[in-house]
Regions:
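Catalytic domains of carbohydrate-active enzymes, especially glycoside hydrolases
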Residues: 25-41, 219-220
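Glycine-rich beta-strand-to-loop/alpha-helix junction loops that act as flexible
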Residues: 40-43, 154-157
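Generic short alpha-helical segment signal, independent of protein family or function
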Residues: 35, 66-69
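Flavin-dependent oxidoreductase catalytic cores
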Residues: 38, 75-78
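Active-site-adjacent loop and "lid" segments of alpha/beta metabolic enzymes
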Residues: 11-21, 25-26, 45-63, 67, ...
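Conserved, mostly hydrophobic/aromatic
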Residues: 4, 30, 34, 79, ...
């Protein structure tokens, strides 16, 4: 899953893709480089972020979404915690809702059910009670009419967690994963990578990101969310080839 941030203040690439032309170019490039999904966000969720309004988030998204859906063939997700933004994005043909709050607002389930779209549910707490959270959210989503195949879980690397907690999660993904649901991991350029490597700037954390995501895939992750698509695709092709060879 390739990341496209339309924000001026994201922790690693803020301001890089936040005008119309560069955003469209990057979306097409992400697909060309081999991503299976495109995740578009217009709200920075870096540590200590201040949320922008629903109106501001939609102003950043609306023109780009409409064009991108006509330019790329891979499924597109919208990274938002506002139900109304998710609903509007569905009207533009977006395929997946990616909610970092873990669908704290149950309207997200109603929207996903109405539009028959995918939904990513993120664990956003500073504890390791992740599987029980996933099980609770799975039951809740089914009660709203969603099918298990629509639901993807994210253990929330870097969301209110310590470096050791993040490492524990990556090491124990097989124990966290629910077999009937896809598992997404997003460690790209995050604090755990920096903390292990002398805290280089986020843009210099690609090798560490690849190491973390390789471990994640070997431990059961189905999707990894990345900034550096070309390099991640190559690394995971090699990982999967070796892992699947007798």
């Amino acid at each position: 899953m390739g990341i496209l941030n339309l924000t001026p203040d994201s922790f690693s690439d803020g301001g890089k893709w936040n005008n119309f032309e560069t955003a469209i170019h990057r979306a097409m490039e992400i697909e060309e480089q081999g991503a299976h999904f495109l995740d578009i966000g217009a709200q920075s969720t870096r540590p200590g972020y201040v949320a922008v309004s629903e109106e501001e988030e939609w102003n950043r998204l609306k023109c780009v979404l409409k064009v991108i859906k006509n330019k790329v063939k891979i499924p597109v997700s919208v990274d938002t915690f506002y139900p109304e933004i998710a609903r509007r994005a569905m009207e533009y043909g977006v395929d997946i809702i990616n909610d970092i709050t873990g669908c704290e607002n149950s309207k997200m389930f109603e929207i996903a059910c109405k539009y028959n779209c995918g939904i990513v549910i993120n664990h956003n707490f500073g504890n390791l009670e992740i599987k029980s959270f996933f099980e609770k959210k799975l039951l809740e989503s089914i009660q709203y009419g969603l099918r298990p195949q629509q639901i993807c879980f994210d253990p929330g690397i870097g969301f209110n967690k310590t470096r050791n907690q993040d490492a524990h999660i990556l090491k124990h993904l097989k124990e966290i994963k629910i077999s009937q649901n896809a598992l997404l991991v997003g460690a790209s350029r995050k604090r755990i990578i920096g903390a292990c490597c002398g805290n280089p700037p986020p843009q210099e954390r690609m090798p560490g990101t690849i190491a973390a995501h390789t471990i994640a895939v070997l431990n059961g992750a189905n999707i990894v969310r990345v900034h550096d698509v070309k390099e991640a695709v190559q690394a995971l092709k090699v990982t999967n080839f070796i892992n699947n060879t007798d």
